[in-house]
Amino acid sequence: MKTPRHPSMGKQHGSALVVVLLIFALAFALSVEVVYRQHRVQTRTANLLDWDYRYQYAIAAETLAIQGLIDDFEDDQRNNELVDDCSKEKWAGPFSFPYEDSVISATVQDLQGRFNINSLVVFNNNEYQRDPEAIARFEALLAGLLPPSHARYASTLANEMADWLDTDTLVNGPEGAEDGEYRLRRTPNQPILDESEFRALRSFDAELADAINAMQKPTPQATTNNPATLRFWDYFTALPLGTTLNVNTAPKAVLEAWFAPYNAQAAAQTILQDRETNPYTDTNAILALPAFSNLAPDQRSALQAQLGVGTSHFQVVIDVAMASGLSRLVTRIQRPSQGDTRVFSRSLVPVLSALEPACNPD
């Protein structure tokens, strides 16, 4: 006679099967998560290693560029011709070469051929004071470089930038802006370290930024040698007070703006033509141009003190391309007439366009 099966035993077997299935599902889910996390860690590690490879290659290229600038300066000393221009310098051309599994490209720019925003103030009586002549230059440059729809901002931006730099907290004129106009931050009231602070001005709003970005948006024709678009930021820099403007590398827009207070913009075209074949070796030749014949002695002395034919400040832009990606290093270098050549700024920036043109744009 068969023993009758207890009803609860079937339920226990069913519950055990469900528990086994749940354990199996949980183990499978945990395994998938472990594999996923391991893959993510491996991918992240590989990306970091690739990034580090590109960065180390860029640093190596930076070291090579520094040595090239030192060699160039020593050659100039031997030749007794301390001149930096865009036609004869070894550093003036773009460079590109393969190295192991990468391609390294680089260009060098003369920062003293750009408009020094810090020149808007002078240090006098233990404080930084506005320089009306420099502000007029800055306004003239902005008027020519800003998008046509925003050219009216030139005067406002020039005065706001001067207020950003000067020591006092007084708004100078209806177009200025001091601490009270800025929330969550205060004006530095001293020279800036980078021209990007220009973006912090009250009137440099999102609309203006978008207009500038649209104006210099990269095109398919853009290359290292031919950017194919106007680069707004290529015309500005932030260097120590008293740094001279190198007339042998300054683009036409900067030269015209610099001479605007003297109504001598015509000198810019003459300088551009002359330096193509015979770079200027001293500033006396510049002041001898007909456009400056009507300058008063004090104006002549002041202008001569602001101009130069060589440079001590350079920018090196380095792109390192590998199968894994592209990195860009921007290094700024000081090469003084006495003392060691040194890096005073180094930053990794997004690669949003072609390399900046070698030397400076015309």
Report the location of each language-model feature.
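Compositionally biased linear targeting/interaction segments
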Residues: 2-9, 15-362
